[in-house]
A protein has these predicted regions:
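Glycine-rich loop-to-alpha-helix module at the N-terminal edge of alpha/beta enzyme cores
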Residues: 36, 50-126
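Terminal low-complexity tails and localization/encapsulation signals of metabolic enzymes
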Residues: 1-52, 85, 89
């Protein structure tokens, strides 16, 4: 099992984002899977392990693609105001989690905190 960094600030950030030491790497939105081998994210800042995620198997990939194709059939007939509401809610979550996401981006990518916040802001602006 991978060790999560002992840095208190990063540990708090991971907790705020509900990231554990081992995380499922595959999700259909309703189901997650963690049957693949673990890949560990290592911070270039201090060389410490951040967390691990399971690799998606070919079978899991096919399931995700099939589920996405089925979801698209529902999404495309949903009225624009309802689709807009989904996008608005997603945007609200990004805004709510901007600081911890920015911290994680900076730690995981070796960027400054301001650059990490900027990356998240770009997602919000889209």
């Amino acid at each position: 099992m991978a060790q999560t960094t002992d840095n208190a600030a990063i540990a708090e950030t991971l907790k705020a984002l509900e990231i554990t030491s081992e995380n499922a790497g595959t999700s259909t939105g309703l189901q997650t899977s963690n049957s693949g081998k673990l890949i560990t994210s290592v911070s270039p800042v201090d060389g410490k392990n951040i967390a691990s995620v399971t690799q998606t198997t070919p079978e899991e990939y096919e399931q995700v693609v099939q589920t996405a194709a089925e979801a698209f059939k529902v999404w495309r007939v949903m009225p624009a105001p309802q689709r807009g509401e989904v996008v608005r809610q997603f945007n609200e979550e990004l805004r709510r989690l901007k600081e911890p996401l920015g911290k994680l981006v900076s730690y995981e990518m070796g960027k400054s905190y301001q650059e990490g916040l900027g990356e998240v802001q770009e997602m919000i602006d889209i």
